[in-house]
């Protein structure tokens, strides 16, 4: 198989090691450079740098946007990792996946990703971090799995950085996705309520779940 890590926030490496040797990663791709999405990236680079069993001729490929040149340059570490740019106007092929991008609404430049497995046609869409955008209805159209930034409860619509539960559900319905998974969950409030609000907006035909540590979704 091909092991692609999407974002590398705090504690990512610790949890990853419970399932996969980080040396077996084939690539990393980043939606944006906020700390909660890249906090463990440097730790991962050190892991590759110092591990005695690593093939020194193999560099870890890390993909990111170039609109923050300082952070993009940090993706490359000599003899360890190589930073590769992606662009909204271009389709990117990484291993068995074809990836397209859409810029989101967020305080820093961030991109959503539509990832298609070439051999099966299965579609995974990750919003990155974003406020509500109608264009997600087309970007996520017919996705098998729609992973949506849902930090806010219903009643906080049109936020400048994150979806509400209602917005996530409405977009899932408009896009006709098969499964909606809520991520970037709030540290406050009743998460079952958040899920129920999203389910109500999505309708009965779409399965809605909460993301959780160690949870696996088969597409």
Please report, for each region that a protein language model flagged, where it lies by residue.
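Conserved beta-strand hairpin/beta-sheet module of binuclear metal-dependent hydrolase folds
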Residues: 1-20, 110-128, 145
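Short gly/ser/thr-rich secondary-structure transition/capping motifs
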Residues: 9-11, 80-86, 125-131, 162
């Amino acid at each position: 198989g091909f092991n692609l890590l999407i974002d590398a926030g705090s504690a990512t490496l610790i949890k990853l090691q419970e399932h996969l040797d980080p040396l077996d990663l084939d690539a990393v791709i980043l939606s944006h450079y906020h700390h909660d999405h890249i906090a463990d990236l440097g730790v991962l680079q050190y892991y590759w740098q110092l591990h005695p069993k690593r093939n020194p001729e193999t560099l870890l490929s890390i993909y990111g946007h170039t609109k923050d040149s300082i952070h993009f340059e940090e993706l490359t570490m000599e003899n360890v990792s190589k930073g590769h740019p992606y662009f909204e106007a271009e389709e990117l092929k990484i291993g068995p996946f074809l990836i397209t991008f859409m810029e989101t609404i967020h305080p820093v430049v961030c991109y959503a990703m539509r990832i298609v497995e070439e051999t099966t046609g299965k579609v995974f869409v990750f919003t990155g971090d974003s406020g509500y955008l109608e264009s997600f209805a087309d970007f996520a159209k017919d996705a098998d799995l729609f992973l949506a930034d849902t930090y806010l409860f219903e009643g906080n619509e049109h936020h400048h950085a994150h979806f509400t539960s209602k917005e996530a559900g409405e977009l899932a319905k408009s896009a006709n996705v098969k499964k909606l998974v809520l991520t970037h969950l709030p540290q406050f409030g009743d998460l079952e309520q958040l899920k129920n609000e999203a389910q109500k907006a999505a309708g009965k035909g779409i399965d809605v779940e909460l993301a959780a540590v160690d949870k696996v979704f088969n597409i």
